[in-house]
């Protein structure tokens, strides 16, 4: 029975995924982007009037009434997993592998199955838009569709700006943004489906999902970290030595994973091998600033390892309670991680040393500053992503998901307004935006973060300080 989010699925579809990875590298020379077919297709996918390529593919396959019910259940199950996954590179990679698996299971003779990715086919941006940005699979009330479409327009506008490096001068945030500043700031937030913490279930996920995945006795799937490390170490500078906090033994452990087999992916010659397959990442680029990178390794850990969400929560509490004095957060992080026995609550040495290998600034950004990191930490469910399901309950969950009963919202946190503002904020960091527009976005984001009880450093500081 098909279960998403498995390392074995990624390795099994290596040949197809290599095409996707090759099409997710930036051109070697930026001036070549204008006529580059990959960049042209990505730009076209981000046009508000362009159809979703994944939706088009799926509808072309299910027109036939003989489409097996198992396809709908497998696809809905993948969508359910994506609903509880962080928006990052690893999630896009896992979704791509699972889509390959579903196609090979149910349409083995279709030509599209063996040419799923690459120019003229699906690209990383198409997977991001379908599964994580627009979430085309979500069941939505008819009266909400137009409002959500307006928010999706804003998201695609700023994602396109991150690709081109600038937001159109005609864009005006005040006239494009739905007014929320006069709404009541107390009580349940009207812009999303958050439940009160006193009435929400203990685990936060739906009851059927808890019965399917939760329980200390449930075995966990293998980590996806080896694939993440392998691919990024061979195609980018993100994991280049020396990582400031990786001592020699730690680096050798990371390299032992990478060197234990042939590289999963070897980038083509005519490509930028400093930024990796960044076109599968939300920011569509790898940029550095003040000891941080736009590709957050800690967000990748959330999607790649079952221990990561709890470990990072524990680390955050440890940093806050480490010293009673008014010591800066960056210093607190450095002091906590300076202990050679730091993070004993993480059993996997690879995860522990990857986190400890991050700079204090990277950890500060993820735990206390960046809205996208905070959103990822809020929506992720390690039980859904990494617990092996109970067979009978899993059959019920698949049927329910295929009927759309579990795809209306992420019950941990689901707010289109906040998600849209977070994308706009990332656009401020990675594209040229007018000063007035930038101030208006930060003002609205700050208010929404406060209303949703997301306690972070002020976004204006983060936008100037970190990548």
From Swiss-Prot:
**Name of the gene this protein is made from:** ORF68
Tell me the Pfam families matching this sequence.
Answer: Herpes_env
Q: Where is this region: Zinc finger 1?
A: 52-136
Complex and partners: Forms a homopentameric ring.
Q: Where does Zn(2+) 1 bind?
A: 52, 55, 130, 136
Q: Which family does it belong to?
A: Belongs to the herpesviridae UL32 protein family.
Natural source organism = Human herpesvirus 8 type P (isolate GK18) (HHV-8)
Q: Please give the InterPro entries that the UniProt record associates with this protein.
A: Herpes_env
Task of the protein: Plays a role in efficient localization of neo-synthesized capsids to nuclear replication compartments, thereby controlling cleavage and packaging of virus genomic DNA. Facilitates thereby the transfer of newly replicated viral genomes to the packaging motor.
Principal location class = host cell
What is the protein's name according to its record? Packaging protein UL32 homolog
Enumerate the UniProt keywords alphabetically.
Host cytoplasm, Host nucleus, Metal-binding, Zinc, Zinc-finger
Q: Outline the segment boundaries, as ranges, of region: Zinc finger 2.
A: 296-373
Please state where this protein is localized. Answer: Host cytoplasm; Host nucleus
The residues listed in the UniProt record as binding Zn(2+) 3, with positions renumbered to this chain, are: 191-192, 415, 452
Q: Region labeled Zinc finger 3 — which residues?
A: 191-452
* Effect of inactivating the gene: Deletion mutants maintain viral DNA replication and late gene expression but does not produce infectious virions. In addition, viral DNA is not cleaved after replication.
Q: Where does Zn(2+) 2 bind?
A: 296, 299, 366, 373
């Amino acid at each position: 029975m098909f279960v998403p989010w498995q390392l074995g699925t990624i390795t099994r579809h290596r040949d197809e995924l290599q095409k996707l990875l090759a099409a997710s590298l930036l051109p070697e020379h930026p001036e070549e982007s204008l006529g580059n077919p990959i960049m042209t297709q990505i730009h076209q996918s981000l046009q508000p009037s362009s159809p979703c390529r994944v939706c088009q593919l799926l509808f072309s396959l299910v027109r036939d009434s003989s489409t097996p019910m198992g396809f709908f259940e497998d696809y809905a199950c993948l969508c359910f997993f994506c609903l509880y996954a962080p928006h990052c590179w690893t999630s896009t990679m896992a979704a791509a592998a699972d889509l390959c698996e579903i196609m090979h299971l149910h349409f083995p003779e279709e030509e599209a199955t063996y040419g799923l990715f690459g120019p003229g086919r699906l690209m990383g941006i198409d997977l991001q838009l379908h599964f994580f940005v627009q979430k085309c699979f979500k069941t939505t009330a008819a009266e909400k569709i137009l409002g959500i479409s307006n928010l999706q327009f804003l998201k695609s506008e700023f994602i396109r700006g991150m690709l081109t490096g600038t937001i159109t001068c005609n864009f005006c945030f005040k006239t494009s943004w739905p007014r929320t500043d006069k709404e009541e700031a107390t009580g349940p937030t009207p812009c999303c489906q958050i439940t009160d913490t006193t009435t929400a279930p203990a685990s936060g996920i739906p009851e059927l999902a808890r019965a399917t995945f939760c329980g200390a006795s449930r075995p966990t799937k293998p980590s996806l970290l080896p694939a993440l490390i392998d691919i990024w170490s061979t195609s980018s500078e993100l994991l280049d030595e020396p990582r400031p906090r990786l001592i020699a033994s730690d680096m050798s452990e990371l390299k032992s994973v990478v060197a234990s087999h042939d590289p999963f992916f070897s980038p083509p010659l005519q490509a930028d091998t400093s930024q990796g397959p960044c076109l599968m990442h939300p920011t569509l680029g790898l940029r550095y600033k003040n000891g941080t990178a736009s590709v957050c390794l800690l967000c990748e850990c959330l999607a790649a390892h079952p221990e990561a969400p709890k470990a990072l929560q524990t680390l955050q509490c440890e940093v806050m309670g480490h010293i009673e004095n008014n010591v800066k957060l960056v210093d607190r992080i450095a002091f906590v991680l300076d202990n050679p026995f730091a993070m004993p609550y993480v059993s996997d040495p690879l995860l522990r040393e990857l986190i400890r290998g991050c700079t204090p600034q990277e950890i500060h950004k993820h735990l206390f500053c960046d809205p996208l990191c905070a959103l990822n930490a809020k929506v992720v469910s390690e039980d859904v992503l990494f617990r092996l399901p109970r067979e009978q309950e899993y059959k019920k969950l698949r049927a329910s998901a295929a009927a759309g009963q579990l795809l209306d919202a992420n019950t941990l946190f689901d707010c289109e307004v906040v998600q849209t503002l977070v994308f706009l904020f990332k656009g401020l960091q990675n594209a040229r935006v007018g000063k007035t527009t930038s101030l208006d976005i930060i003002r609205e984001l700050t208010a929404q973060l406060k209303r949703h009880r997301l306690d972070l450093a002020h976004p204006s500081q983060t936008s100037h300080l970190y990548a």
